[in-house]
């Protein structure tokens, strides 16, 4: 099977030379999402809102790939301030059920458009 680009009109358009996701066989690779409102392409205000927007954007891309958030097996989270790590954990519980995906949380100096958080992931379909 060839790789297929996945794009959702309900998630922010790519701001570079990448697809929102790529599907190959039973694997889906999600590009990073930041807290962009897909209607305005502007960042939502504050870390709390950005975390929610990131997960909502990921869900829209996942839905466009005919999968669900429960198919996420690995999640990578990038934070400009690791003091927000506990808040990410708290909000993740609203979107993911146990068993939670494997995850990395990485502190970074900056993110595109001045975002406070970015997340990407990997899915395996049955």
Task: For the regions a language model picked out, list residue spans one by one.
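Short, polar/acidic, helix-capping and beta-turn segments at strand->helix junctions
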Residues: 2-126
């Amino acid at each position: 099977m060839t790789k297929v680009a996945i794009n959702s009109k309900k998630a922010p358009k790519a701001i570079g030379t990448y697809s929102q996701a790529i599907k190959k066989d039973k694997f889906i690779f999600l590009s990073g999402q930041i807290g962009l409102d897909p209607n305005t392409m502007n960042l939502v205000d504050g870390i709390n809102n950005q975390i929610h927007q990131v997960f909502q954007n990921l869900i829209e891309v996942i839905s466009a790939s005919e999968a669900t958030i429960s198919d996420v097996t690995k999640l990578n989270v990038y934070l400009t301030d690791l003091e927000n790590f506990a808040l990410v954990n708290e909000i993740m519980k609203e979107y993911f059920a146990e068993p939670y995906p494997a995850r990395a949380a990485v502190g970074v100096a900056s993110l595109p458009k001045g975002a406070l958080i970015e997340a990407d992931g990997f899915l395996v379909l049955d």
